[in-house]
Amino acid sequence: MCGIAGWYRRGGRMVPGDAIVAACDRLKQRGPDDSGFLVEGDFGFGMRRLSIIDIAGGRQPIFSPDGRHAIIFNGEIYNHPELRRELAGSYDFRTDHSDTE
């Protein structure tokens, strides 16, 4: 079990970063092992993580290789080892075992 929080403000108004942190702090019981946040202008999201798969390398948010895109993921992809092998030639994985990447 993990927890995700997000905030979007229309009209280009800045999202208060401390509000995302506070929202995720309220989710600590859902994910006591780790937290991660991203605030960019009018959008922000954060997460609390219960570390099960790739405890050290699965920190979030995870960014695309060019840094333009970020993801926070809550779920499990059970066949991620097979998918990783299948995509190995076309994607440069940065973690060893994360099912998010």
Q: Which residues does each predicted region cover?
A:
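N-terminus-centric sequence/structural signature that marks the extreme N-terminus
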Residues: 1-101
